[in-house]
Amino acid sequence: MSDVAVGLTADKVCDSALAFESVCRSEKGAGEILSGITARFAASRLVALVGADGAGKTTLMRIAAGILQPSAGHVLVFGEELYGKKLAHLQKQCGYMPQKFGLYEDLSVAENFKLYADLFGLSEEQRKERTKELLEMTALTAFTERPAGKLSGGMKQKLGLACALLNRPRILLLDEPTVGVDPLSRRDLWRILRENAAARDMLIVVATTYMDEAALCDDVIILEEGHMRVTGTPESIARHAQGCTFFAEQEKKELPVRLLQDRLIADTEHLLDAVPEATGVRLLTNGTSDVQKLQALYPGVRFTERPSTLEDGYLVLRKEFLGDWRLEAEESLSLFESSATADSDPAITGNPDSVIHAKGLVRRFGSFVAVDKTDFDVARGEIFGLLGPNGAGKTTTFKMLCGLLEVSEGELCVAGIDVRHAREKARELLGYMSQKFSLYPGLSVLENLTFFAGAYGLTGSRGKQRIAQVLQAFGLETFASRAAGSLPGGYKQRLSMATALLHRPQILFLDEPTSGADIPTRRRFWRWVTALARNGTTVVVTTHFMEEALYCDRILIQDAGKSLILGTPEAVRSGCATMNEAFIRVVTQARHAEADRRKETS
C-alpha cells in the first residue's frame, strides 16, 4: 500500500499529527522487518494497528516513539522530521507505553509518578496537579505507597498509562496495553482512552491482537509481514466478509458447544473460522454461502445469518495475504490424539469421576488470605476454567493445584494423590505452562526441549524420538537452533506447550496460555487443547479472554480469594449477551454485596 491517510481528507493531509514516508527497518539476522510503510494519522483519532505475531507492530511503534531509527524513510511529527535536530523536543510530544508497561517495579506508585515527572521536566506544581488528576482517573489514589511490582496486572496497566499521560502528550502510542488484563480493567482503559482522545485533541495508536478492541477504534490498519496491507474503518473492513457469516446451533443440545466448534473448524473446504459463542458457534465460510447449503452439509445443526464483524473481515483478508493457517494445525493433531492414552496412569483411570478434588482450600501469606475456602472437582477429560480479575486468587489456586505452593488449610487431591503430603509425586503427573512460558531464553529451542526431556526422565533414543515429534507437531523444526528468547510470542507459546507435553502428562495446567497471541495462534492452540481433552487429558486453564471461557466445560469465577460462581459457561452467562458482560456482572455484584456487608457490620 503506497499511501494511507487515516482520518484525513485530501486537503488536510499536510496537517497530520504523525506521518510515515517509505519507512523501512532491517536488522542483522532477521532481514527486513518493515517495508515501505507510508501513512499519515490525524489528531483526535483512535487508531488500531493489528496483525499477526511478527508482523512488525512493535517495531513500527518504537520507530514512532523515537527510540528505534528506521533504516530508510522519514517519520514526521506535526510536520517536522522526528529523527533530526529536534528529536528530544518531538519525543516529548509522544507518550509511549511498551508491552511491559515501562514501570519501575521496586518504586511505589507515587515514586513512579515523581520519576516520570522529573524525566519530563515538569515543575513541582505541574507534577502534583497532574498526578492527582491521573490518580483519580485511574482509581489508584488508595495505592500510592504500594510498590508497582506488587500491583495487580490491571493496576500496573493503569499506572503505565497514567505515567505515559503525565506529560500531556499530543500523540499516545500503546503497544498491546491489555495483554493479561481482566475485562473490568480493559473496560476502564478504553474509557480513559476515548475520554482523552476527545478532550485533548490527541492521536492515540493502539497495537493489539484483539479484534473486539480494534473495533472500538475510529480506524484500523492491518500490518502483515512488515507490509501495510489494508486500512479502513472497522465497518468497512467487516464488509469484506459479507455473505460469509453465520451462527450454528445444535437442534438437540447433546454435545458441549466446544465439540461442535471442533467439528466445524476442521472443515477447511467450506469454513474459514468457527468460534464458540453463547449457545452455539460463530461461523465464517470460505466464500459466500447460504443457510440451505450449510444445512445440507450438517444435518442436525441449525444455521442463521449474522452481521459480519471486524474479526471476520480481517480473517478473510488475512487468508488472501498469508493463506489458511488451519492446514498446519490439522497436520499436527495426530500427536495430541495419542498423547492422553499413551502412558495411562492407574490413579486416573481408576477414578475417572474426580481427577482433581479441592475442598475448603485456603492459602495464607501471613495474615493475608489469598484463597478462602474454595471447593471444586474436575473430571477426567474435562476442560476447567479458573477466571477472575487481576489479583483474584486464580494463580495462587493454580500453584497449589500444581504443587508449587503449600496448602494452608483444606483438602487437595490430584490424580488420587494428597498434594498436601506428596507434592513431588503429584507433579510427575502434571504438565505446566505458565503465562511467562518458563523457558530458558539463552538456550535454543532444541536445547530447551532437551533440558525438559531430561528433567522428565526422557533420555536416549526415547527422548530424541519424543523431541522430534513435538518439533514437528508444533511447527518448530525450522527454529530448532534459534534462541528461545528471540522467538516471536506465538512461537514461544508453542515451545512452552511442547515442553509441557513432552512427558505425556495426564493433567495439563495452562496459566493464561494465549495472552497476547494472535487469532490463528489462539485458534490453533484450542484445537490442540480440545483434542487432548477428547482423548482423556484433564485441562485446567486460567484466562482473561472471555471468548476462551466458552471452550471450557465448566468455569469458576473468583474475586478477592473467594469463589463467586461455578457452572457451565451457558449457566454463568445466563441473562447476558456475552461472557464479558456476565463476568463483569458477577464480579461487580459480589463487590457491591461485600461493600454493603461491611457497611452493616461497621
Could you describe each region identified by the protein language model?
Residues 50-52, 387-389:
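The feature captures the beta-strand-to-loop junction immediately N-terminal to the Walker
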Residues 65, 402:
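Helix-to-loop junction immediately C-terminal to a conserved catalytic motif
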Residues 73-83, 89-90, 410-418, 425-426:
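Conserved ABC transporter NBD signature motif
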Residues 114, 118, 125-143, 450, ...:
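Conserved ABC ATPase "signature" region
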Residues 172-176, 508-511:
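Catalytic Walker B motif of ABC-type/P-loop ATPase nucleotide-binding domains
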Residues 192-287, 527-541, 546-592:
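ABC transporter nucleotide-binding domain
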